[in-house]
Amino acid sequence: MIPVQGVQNQTIAVLGLGRSGRATAAALAAGGARVVAWDDGVDTREQAEQEGLHLLDLTQDQNWDGISALIASPGIPHLYPKPHPVIARAYALGVPVDNDIGLFFRSFATAEWERFDTTPRVIAVTGSNGKSTTTALIHHILKETGRPTQIGGNIGTGVLSLDPAHDGEVVVLELSSYQTDLARALTPDVAVFTNLSPDHLDRHGGLGGYFAAKRRLFAEGGPDRAVIGVDEVEGRYLAGQLGMGAADDRVIRVSSGQKLEGFGWSVFARKGYLAEYRKGRQVASIDLRGIQGLPGAHNHQNACAAYAAARAVGIAPREIERAFHSFQGLPHRSQTVAEIGGVAWVNDSKATNVDAAAKALAAFPRIRWIAGGMGKDGGIEALAPCLGPVVKAYLIGHSARDFALQIGQTPYEIVETMEQAVARAAAEAQPGETVLLAPAAASFDQYPNFEKRGEHFTALVKALQA
C-alpha cells in the first residue's frame, strides 16, 4: 500500500466503495486521515461497514462540515452527462474533488528515495485502443530485462494498493479518460498516447472533451519523454504542441504505417518490421512477423509504443526484441483460443468500438464475424471499407438489427445470442477461415463487462473441442 501524503488529521470523504474505493480509504487512513465514506448501494455500504469503514451520508448538506476533500472512485460521473449528486454537492460547497490517481502522484515520492542509487519512475499509458496491451507489454519488457517493476491503474492492481517504490523501480500505469480527467496531479516521467477514436463520449461531452481528458496526462510541465501515436490528427497535434520542432527528441513519434524519418526520435512499423530512427538515422530494426503475442497491424502499433517507452527508460533494442518473443498477449485482445478443423477462433471482445473492430478485421484474410451488443453513437457505417474479408456476419444483442442495416452487401444472419452465433459459425466455417469475435459494441446488454463476454465465447469454443 502507498500511504497518502499531506492528509494527516484531515477529514477526507470517499465516494464509491468498490475495490478501488476501499483501497483508497485504507491508503488515506494509513496517511493519517480521518476517513468517511459513502456508496449508493445498500449492500456495498453494509459490506464496507463490516470492514470497519465509517459511513456518512454525503447526500445530506449537514454532513459536510469539516470535510477537506472528496475522493471519487473511477466510473462515477463527475461532469457529463451530469455530475453525481454527491460530487455536485462538493462543487457547490467548494470542496476539492480528486481520485486515487491524483493521490498516487502526490504520494509516490518518499523521503526514502534519498538513499536510492536510481530514482523510481512512472510510465503512464492512455489512449482509446491498445493501452492495456501496450501497458502489459512495457511491464513485460521491464520484467524480462531484470528491472524492478509494478503494473497497475486501469489494469491489474489499483494504484494505491501498489507497494512503495524500490530503488530503480519503474511503475507502469494504464490510465483511462475517466482517471486522467479528474486527477488533480498527473506527473509521469514517461507518458504514452496510443491513439484516439470516439468512445465514452457521453461521459466527456463529445470528442473534444474526450481528447482533452487524454491530453491532461501531458500537462503540468509535461513528462520527461512523451511517446505519441501520430496515426490520427489528434496525435499529430499533441506531438506538435509538446515538441519544440521536429528535431526535439523529448517527443517520440510512433506509427503503424507511416515512415517517420525526419524527426528527432521516431519508431514506426511497416510491412511487419519495426524501425527506430534518431535524428534522421536508423539505429535499430525488429522483425515483428511471426511474434505470436503481437498479431496484426494494430499490435504492431502497440509494439512501437511499448518499444519507445522502454527505450525512454534505457532498455536496449535487442533486449526489447527478446522480450517481444516471450510476450503472450492479453485475454480478449486478438486472443486465439482454439483451432478446430483448420478454423481459427479469435476472441477480441475488447474491440468495443469501431476503430478497434476495424483493426481486428484487418488482421485476417477470411472472417466469419461475430458482432453486436450495446451499440455506440455513430453506429458502424464507418466499418464499410473494412468488411472485404468478411465472409458472413453473425449479429447478436441489442444492436443486431441496426448493424444489419449498416453493413451494406455483407452477408449476415441475426442470431441474437452468443450461443447461436458460435453454433452457426461452427456449422458454416471452412478450413482457412477465422471466426472472429470483434463486437464493435459494448457488452452491457447481455454481459456485465467485455471480459465476461469473451469468457463466454471462449467457453463455447472450448466446448466444441470436447
Curated annotation (Swiss-Prot):
Pathway: Cell wall biogenesis; peptidoglycan biosynthesis. It is an enzyme of class 6 (ligase). It catalyses: UDP-N-acetyl-alpha-D-muramoyl-L-alanine + D-glutamate + ATP = UDP-N-acetyl-alpha-D-muramoyl-L-alanyl-D-glutamate + ADP + phosphate + H(+). Gene3D superfamilies: Mur ligase, C-terminal domain, Mur-like, catalytic domain, NAD(P)-binding Rossmann-like Domain. One of its GO terms (cellular component) is cytoplasm. Keywords: ATP-binding, Cell cycle, Cell division, Cell shape, Cell wall biogenesis/degradation, Cytoplasm, Ligase, Nucleotide-binding, Peptidoglycan synthesis. Its main location: cytoplasm. The keyword Nucleotide-binding applies. ATP binds at G127, S128, N129, G130, K131, S132, T133. One of its GO terms (molecular function) is UDP-N-acetylmuramoylalanine-D-glutamate ligase activity. One of its GO terms (biological process) is cell wall organization. InterPro entries: Mur-like_cat_sf, Mur_ligase_C, Mur_ligase_C_dom_sf, Mur_ligase_cen, MurD, NAD(P)-bd_dom_sf. Signal peptide: none annotated. Belongs to the MurCDEF family. This is UDP-N-acetylmuramoylalanine--D-glutamate ligase.
